[in-house]
Structures are given as C-alpha cells and as structure tokens.
Amino acid sequence: MVEILDYTKALEVLKEYPGDGLHVDTLLDSDSHGALTYNDFLILPGSITFPASDVSLETRVTRRFTIKAPLLSSPMDTVTEHSMAIHMALLGGLGVIHNNCPPDEQAEMVRKVKRYENGFIQDPIVLSPETTVGEAKELKTKWGFGGFPVTEKGTLHSKLLGIVTSRDIQFHKNHEDPVTAVMATDLVTAPAGTTLAEANEVLRSSKKGKLPIVDKDGSLISLLSRSDLMKNIHYPLASKLPSKQLLCAAAISTHDADKVRLQKLVDAGLDIVVVDSSQGHSTFQIAMIKYIKQNFPDIDVIGGNIVTREQAAALIAAGADGLRIGMGSGSACITQEVMAAGRPQAAAVRSVSAFAARFGVPTIADGGVQNLGHIVKGLALGASAVMMGSLLAGTTESPGEYFMSSEGQLVKAFRGMGSIAVMEDKSKSGAGNNAGASRYFSENDKVKVAQGVAGSVIDRGSITQYVPYLVAGVQHSLQDIGVQNLDALREGVNNGTVRFEMRSASAQTEGNVHGLHTHEKKLYSS
C-alpha cells in the first residue's frame, strides 16, 4: 500500500526528484534523436508571481541598438518597404527595407522613415517665398505631411517668414500663387537653447501644429511638430534614437556595386545595415562587413544568414554587430529541398546564439515562424529577436494590393526572394543587380535554380493591431514560463530552471484543435 504523506511536506519531498522535463542541451542533442525545429518541443510552465503587463520584452538587436519588442520584418519585396518599416518601429520592433529596387528608391524609403518622427527636426523641408502653392502640394504628397516653414532664402539659418500648413493649401485653387499668399504669420516660436521638454510644453499650450526654434536674429534653426508629440503618446514602445527619429534598417547585397547603394542609404540616415545573403559564410560577405566597419563606423552591421558556429565565428571575426540565423526554414523557401543544405531552425538558433553570446553579439531567428508560439521558442533558444516574413506579408502595411483568391478570400502576393518570380523580375531592380539573384549567388547563371516559391497569404489586417497581439502574447507566454524579461528567460534556459519537453506526433495533434465538428480560430480581439 502506498504511504500517504503529509501534504504540508510536498515542497520538501519535491527536492527528492530531478527537475521535471529536459535541459535544453538534452532536448537538442541531435546525436540522440536528430535535429529539431519549433514544433518538436514545448517549454514547461513555471510559477506565476507577476502580471503579464510587467513583462519586459526589451532586447538588443545589434551590439548598440535596443528595441522594446523583439520583432523584425524581413527584407523581402512583398514584406518591407517604408510603410512597414515606419509602423514596425512605432510599435517597438524594426523593419528592414528590401533592396530589390534601385538604390535611389531604397534611399528614399529610408528617408521617409527617418522623417516620419522627430524630436527637434534639424533638417526640415524649408520653402522660399517664390515656392508656389502647387509645389507645396507636391511636397505634401511626396512626404506624407504638411507644415513647411518659409524663410527668406528658402533654407535653414535664414529669417523665418511664416509656415504653410495643409489647411492653408488644401482648397486653394490657384496653384501658381506663391506660398506667401496663404502662409500663416502669427507664429509661436521658441529661442535657441530651449530643451525638448520645454519646447514640448510650449507646443502643448500654444495649440499650434509646429514650433519653430529661432536664434536671436529670428533665423530658423530647427522645428518641432505636434504630430510627433502625439506619436510619443500613442506609441510609447517606439524604436527611436535619442534624437527621437525612428530607427531604420535596410538590406544590401554582398556585391561591390552595393557600396554605392550603401553610401546613399547612409546619407539618407540609415542606422543598421543588413548584409543579405542566403549563405552568409562567404569571402564576399566577410569583405563587405569589413568594408562597412572601416568606412561607416557609426553604422551597425547584421550579417547572415547562417546556421552553424563555424559560420558565426567567421562573421563575428569580421566585425558583425548582429547575426541572422536561418537557412531553408522560411515558408516560401525550398533551399533545404533543392540544395540539401541548411539546418532545422531550433537546432540552428540554439547553436549559433549560444556561441555568439560569448562575444556579446545578438542573434535574430529568421524563418520557420508560423505562429506566436514559435516566436517564444526562438527567443527561449537564445535569439534576441525574431524576423518574420509570411506572418506580416498579408498586412495592410506590406507592399502590394489585395486581391480575391479563387476561393473567395482576400489575399496579398507573397514570394520568396529565391523564387524565379523574383530572380526574373526586372521591374523592381531596374538597372541594378536583382536582389533575389544576388542573394542566392545566381546573378550570372544562365540557368536559374529556384530556392523559393511565389504564392499568396491571407489578409491579416493592419500591423497596428497584429503586432500588439504578438507582443501581448509573448508577454503572457513568459508569464506562464515564470520569467519577467528576456534576459531571465535565457538565463533560466542556460541554468536549467526553464525546462523543455519533446513532442511526439500524437502530442502535436493533441496540442492543436481536435475533436470538433467545426470551429472558428480567432486569434485576438482589440
């Protein structure tokens, strides 16, 4: 007969047992059961002692840059252009602008991100007295905002005459009239030396849309915008520099020709460059990383893609500030099938991240993310952040138009950068290198070997609702695991207090919806 113990001694008796579940190294012992991916395991729950709202997701994405939501959008031409990059940054993540376009077009997208939100705007668009109403309307259409200061010479450090707002020009019929005929001259200004906090307070109380900062001679030296003040209130997690500009990243290839592209991106205000290649351990990438670090020391470099410690060591030694992990795991990628090269994502993320952490280099788990749980698993295995392609491709902010599928569903086009559709598309790359062909070392091949496919993804609405769902979901997951931030998650995994369990095929079936005649899978409400 089994002895029934005193229930008050339960915690004491528990000490007689080894920890439930598996240590991460046992879980990922490929000698025992082969390499794993995200669906092959679960994280065991811990103890909840705090609300989910107290969970911090702040993380480093490179050596120098920190973001508050560990989410990045992929540099694919059906995922990230300026609209996606702006909104990812506003929501605490980071968008990486694709390079399958002419350099000037990509630089213009970077410029739009950097101009979207500011503290003191040090390089505002300034009009001269000769600028016409029509020209002001064109500038508003180009940049997506109105409210342009007018100075005597049409430049900064020239005497301020007035401000032209969207309301001033919206219904003005004569496009040939000078802006001086419609501009506002009853301005509230602040003197040089005013702090940002003081200037924001003046802006709040003035009820004006813009606050020009002027020197003792009345010359314009910078500008503050009410819309930026409102963005600070509405987007508290925004990824920003101390100057209050949004953080911006963009991709380039490993080709020497892209050194010119890089210069244009830097001139536009780029913060982080992603050297984009399907196989990052190449002499071309190593040379490009060294070139960037030598010539642009203020720009952080993310190298990749890689899946082994050996690849990681080469890029870290070259000076990479961050690493992108994943080869053949993306939803639109067929590299593993066609090239017989790659690695299951869970094994790759753990191996590379554990090694890179010894050098203080953050890693990004790129590919294989099919749902919210996969994001958490990538982070638990050591990634500082997770990069998404197909999960974001169907959102309002991704490039392209919605269309109706043959099944009557609203969808958007989505294609892997290794697909023939990208490699043969000359409409985006223009006269420059095709980014898809460059990424897969195929630009000079007579026969293009596809490493990706083209298709469509279902409408996911706006990322202004979708990304907050992902953030809240990760917070609740960490609460279930019993850790309050990502550093604690990684520390718990490394020291064995955060435990794992393998999943059989039957366990995976059990852990999904089953046994219902019909069901509706609604992921979130807001």
From Swiss-Prot:
Pfam families reported in the protein's UniProt record: CBS (PF00571), IMPDH (PF00478)
Description of the deletion phenotype: Increases the sensitivity of P.roqueforti towards MPA and decreases MPA production by the fungus.
Domain CBS: start-end pairs: 120-179, 183-239
Binding site for NAD(+): 276-278, 326-328
Keywords: CBS domain, Cytoplasm, GMP biosynthesis, Metal-binding, NAD, Oxidoreductase, Potassium, Purine biosynthesis
One MF annotation (Gene Ontology) recorded for this entry: nucleotide binding
Subcellular location(s) of the protein: Cytoplasm
One GO location term (cellular component): cytoplasm
Positions that bind K(+): 328, 330, 333, 506
EC annotation from Swiss-Prot or TrEMBL: 1.1.1.205
Keyword GTP-binding: no
Biological process (GO), any one: self-resistance to endogenously produced metabolite
Annotated segments matching region Disordered: 506-526
PROSITE patterns: CBS, IMP_DH_GMP_RED
Protein name (Swiss-Prot/TrEMBL): Inosine-5'-monophosphate dehydrogenase
